[in-house]
Each structure stands twice: as C-alpha cells, then as structure tokens.
Amino acid sequence: MAGHSKWANTKYRKERADHKRGKIFSRTIKELMAAVKMGGPDPKTNARLRMIIQKAKDQNIPNENIERNLKKATSADQKNFENVTYELYGHGGVGIIVEAMTDNKNRTASDMRIAVNKRGGSLVEPGSVLYNFVRKGACYVPKSSIDEAVLLPHVIDVGAEDLDNDDDEHFLVLCDPVELASVKEKLTALGVACSEEKLIYVPLRLVDCDEQDGEANLALIEWLEKIDDVDEVYHNMA
C-alpha cells in the first residue's frame, strides 16, 4: 500500500501521518475552490460544492475557513486548479506515482525535478509506472472506532473486495471505484464510521529493496510529500 514499508520506522510513520492530515485539509480547500469555479458559489445549485462543503465539515475544517475560501474562489484573479499525475522510478526499481492538484503546472513540474535532483530517482513517461498499479476505491475506517474482527464481516456484507490494515491509523475497505459511494453508504448504514473515501492506487506487485535503496526511497518519498501541490504519493516498495 501507499507509503507503508518495512523501512519506515515508527517515528517516520507518525511524522508522515501528521503531515498527511494537513494535506487532507489543503486538498479539500482546493477541491472547494475548484468546485466554485466549475459550478458557482451557491451550494443549493452546485451539487459538487455542496458535497465538498459537507466533506470539509466532516474533517472539522472551521466554518470561517470554508467561508473565506468560498469568497476567495469567486475572485476574478483566482486561477483554476487541475489534477496532474507524475510517474517516477525510485531506487532499486521501485515505482512511484505522485498525484497533485495545482494552479500552476510549470511550478509543480519544477518542484518534481528538484526532488529527483536532490534525492535521486527519475521522472518517466506516462504509463511507465502506472501499469504496475490498479485503481481502487477506499473507505478509511479509524482503527480506534472498531475491531478488525467486527469490521471484516461488514466488508463482506457490503460487497467490498478487500480489507487492508497496513495503515497505522485506518483500516482501508477496498472496492471497485464505481462502487465507492455505494460501499460507503452501506458501511455507514451498518454503523461503521468512514473518516474519508477516495480513489487510490494499489500496487499489483511489490519490489524488494536492500537497506540502502529502501532508505533512499523513503527520503525521496518524504521530499515529494512535502511539495505544496502534492496530495498523495504511492509506491510499490515492499
């Protein structure tokens, strides 16, 4: 799974989890602004905006932050955000996928080049890494809210494909992307709390690394994750 590896020690994983919480906040705000650009600032007539506002509230983003960014999104000089994906090979043949949401693709591309210049690896052509991954829907269920033995029968009942427990804080209920909304709704009806649901990349095969390559890949991944525009980094390192 993304970001979980035998080379990642407890301190690294805790720092990464703390950093990702900030990334989730930032991503939701960018999605909100993009939704306003696409469909207007009124959630009554903009269904996507209405959904993202609810998502922001579920993530405990303060109402004043939501309102401030709604106003900012209507500004004439506010640029449009777009999703971009980069593919890299890290050390020891490990594949890395980077998802970003940016209002300046040139800036983001420059940040990616700086990352590989500083931490190694190489940017590659589209499709060079993606073929080693599959797109899945994922419902994030806090481990503090339910035992795995209790959750597993529910995963089967709602028609999900798998339950992944590699993440330190969440169980990931995996499903076909087109079934994500349905699976989330069914889990909620069963009393299972989903803190987030989204599409992710899951590796089809894992690559074993020696210790030197493993540590070098973690350094590269950490650098990539700290790029402002980057939302998610996936890899297939064992």
Curated annotation (Swiss-Prot):
Keywords linked to the UniProt accession:
Cytoplasm, DNA-binding, Transcription, Transcription regulation
**GO (cellular component) term, any one:** cytosol
Gene Ontology MF terms: DNA binding
InterPro entries according to UniProt: Integrase-like_N, TACO1_YebC-like_2nd/3rd_dom, TACO1_YebC_N, Transcrip_reg_TACO1-like, Transcrip_reg_TACO1-like_dom3, YebC-like
Which biological process annotations from GO are given for this protein?
regulation of DNA-templated transcription
Highest taxon in the source lineage? Bacteria
In terms of Gene3D superfamilies, this protein maps to: 1.10.10.200, 3.30.70.980
Question: What family does the Swiss-Prot or TrEMBL record give for this protein?
Answer: Belongs to the TACO1 family.
- Name under which the protein is recorded: Probable transcriptional regulatory protein CAB166
- Species per Swiss-Prot/TrEMBL record: Chlamydia abortus (strain DSM 27085 / S26/3) (Chlamydophila abortus)
The top of its lineage is: Bacteria, Pseudomonadati, Chlamydiota, Chlamydiia, Chlamydiales
